[in-house]
From Swiss-Prot:
Designated gene of the protein: glk
EC id: 2.7.1.2
CDD domains (UniProt xref): ASKHA_NBD_GLK
Lineage: Bacteria, Pseudomonadati, Pseudomonadota, Alphaproteobacteria, Hyphomicrobiales
Subcellular compartments: Cytoplasm
Leading EC class: transferase
Biological process, per Gene Ontology: glycolytic process
Catalysis: reaction(s): D-glucose + ATP = D-glucose 6-phosphate + ADP + H(+)
Xref: NCBIfam families: glk (TIGR00749), PRK00292.1-4 (NF001417)
UniProt family annotation: Belongs to the bacterial glucokinase family.
Record keyword ATP-binding present: yes
Full protein name: Glucokinase
An example Gene Ontology molecular-function term: D-glucose binding
GO CC entries: cytosol
Keyword entries, A-Z: ATP-binding, Cytoplasm, Glycolysis, Kinase, Nucleotide-binding, Transferase
Length: 343
């Protein structure tokens, strides 16, 4: 037997689809192209030493179905036969999966590529709109997801298909604009001298922002975790936490607006991940949308672009499942990202 890389787009069922984030891993199995997915409990990546161990014990040992194909979405760039995950110690080794777990075909995509596939595959009730035109345009879209890290992807519409454009947009520079920003930013933790989007617009970024506000105000922080900060900000019990959520929404709106301009995303900007859902009321309060639209000389364009918060936890699996069922609907390059067993 010889494992080779193949760019052909068609998948043999059953297909195991998996969304591997920095903290959680979600899996489901499609028995055929028409079947509803068989879902499995959400896994904590820290509970398993390797992804192979997680798949074996939590998936394969729990069902009589043996998947022939696997499509994984992972947090981080996909490059080579050993794929390191961002914010997680797992390493994806597709050839080893084929040899050890009985798969015939393994495809690995970027996690926000899967989120991009999802935005044209989800039902309307899986999203909450914040401003912009109510109708859904068949046009380019952007997905932005603050969570363990900050994921970014585009989704470009061609004549006949949707083309996901993955990237590492969470690591772009983010800087101060207002007088208050200039008071806070000197206290934000830097990575090699830079403040990146992920240093503010993520779970740990939320805490970085809170600590920066406390330092600017010359007070001792009393809240430890992003969950504590979010809760205190939402109920108004802590002024610094409340400002943290307001500024988080503002900075997220600025970045979302920048990306909408870069892609000219008339199809909308989509916010995914756990944080936007948890702080939905803060995102709807006004600061987010005001920052999103404040893009002179193109405010009129920005007013029309909708922002939608994805409220469905299994969105990435929905996107991967859509790709598995109807690959011709999408133009996804699997060159160098697909490994097949030839017998």
């Amino acid at each position: 037997m010889q494992a080779i890389i193949d760019a052909e787009q068609s998948f043999k069922f059953p297909v195991l689809v998996g969304d591997i984030g920095g903290t959680n891993a979600r899996f489901s199995i499609l028995v055929d192209s028409n079947a509803e997915p068989k879902e499995f409990p959400v896994l904590q990546t820290a509970d398993y030493a390797t992804i192979d161990e997680a798949i074996q014990h939590a998936i394969l040992d729990q069902t009589a179905i043996q998947p022939r194909s696997v499509i994984l979405a992972v947090a981080g760039p996909v490059d080579g036969d050993e794929i390191d995950l961002t914010n997680c110690d797992w390493v994806v080794r597709p050839k080893k999966m084929i040899a050890d777990l009985g798969f015939e075909d393994v495809t690995v995509l970027n996690d926000f590529e899967a989120q991009a596939l999802a935005v044209v595959s989800l039902e309307g009730h899986h999203m909450e709109q914040i401003g912009g035109k109510p109708e859904e345009a068949v046009a380019t879209r952007v997905v932005l997801g603050p969570g363990t890290g900050l994921g970014v992807a585009g989704l470009v519409r061609t004549r006949h298909a949707w083309v996901p454009v993955p990237g590492e947009g969470g690591h772009i520079d983010i800087g101060p604009r207002t007088e208050r920003d200039y008071q806070i930013f000197p206290h934000i933790e830097r990575i090699e001298g830079r403040v990146t989007g992920e240093q503010i617009l993520s779970g740990r970024g939320l805490r970085n922002l809170y600590l920066g506000i406390c330092a600017a105000d010359k007070i001792t922080p009393t809240l430890e975790t992003p969950v504590d900060i979010t809760s205190a900000g939402l109920d108004g019990s802590n002024p610094q936490a409340a400002e943290t959520l307001d500024l988080f929404a503002t900075y997220l709106g600025r970045l979302a607006g920048d990306l909408a301009l870069i892609f000219m995303a008339h199809g909308g900007v989509y916010l995914s991940g756990g944080i936007p859902v948890r702080i939905l009321s803060a995102l709807k309060a006004g600061s987010f949308r005001a920052a999103f639209e404040d893009k002179a000389p193109h405010k009129a364009i920005m007013r029309d672009i909708p922002v939608r918060v994805i409220t469905y936890q299994l969105a990435a699996l929905t996107g991967l499942s859509a790709f598995a069922r109807t690959p011709s609907r999408f133009e996804v390059s699997t060159e160098g990202r697909r490994w097949r067993m030839r017998r």
